[in-house]
């Protein structure tokens, strides 16, 4: 089953399959052959947790990690009923915090946090060491090509 099938019924709660079209334009091709793998995915920006629930249902053998600053007021304990979801309430762009996370551990790290260019640059600098060999950093919502060139 294609990844976009998992997102049906979650619109507009998750924008990954609607306004941004990340499912069709990237995620389906990237993840479809890895559905049964023991993927360890970290996503910054839990908010209400809808994408984390979907990632956990899709990667049934995987571990889904999320970091959020808690500003949405969402009770993350609701997500923790699923044994392959882990949520951390902290500032994802704070170097002291990020240095407490395991190095060379994650297959994918997605930045769906503040969407601010300075945070996106920090994301690259701080989270690259946390990737396994062959792992990928993914930044959602880059604000334009001018900001993209600032990131590289």
Go through the PLM ranges and name each one.
Residues 1-110, 114-152:
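A short alpha-helical cap/connector motif
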């Amino acid at each position: 089953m294609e990844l976009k099938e998992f997102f049906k019924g979650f619109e507009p709660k998750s924008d990954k399959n609607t306004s941004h079209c990340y499912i069709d334009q990237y995620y389906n091709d990237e993840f479809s052959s890895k559905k049964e793998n023991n993927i360890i995915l970290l996503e910054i920006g839990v908010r209400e947790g809808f994408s984390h629930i979907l990632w956990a249902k899709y990667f049934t053998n995987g571990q889904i990690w999320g970091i959020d600053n808690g500003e949405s007021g969402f009770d993350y304990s609701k997500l923790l009923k699923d044994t392959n979801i882990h949520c951390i309430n902290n500032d994802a762009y704070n170097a002291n915090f990020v240095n407490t996370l395991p190095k060379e551990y994650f297959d994918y790290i997605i930045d769906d946090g503040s969407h601010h260019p300075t945070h996106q640059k920090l994301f690259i600098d701080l989270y690259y060491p946390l990737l396994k060999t062959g792992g990928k950093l993914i930044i959602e919502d880059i604000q334009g090509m001018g900001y993209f060139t600032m990131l590289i």
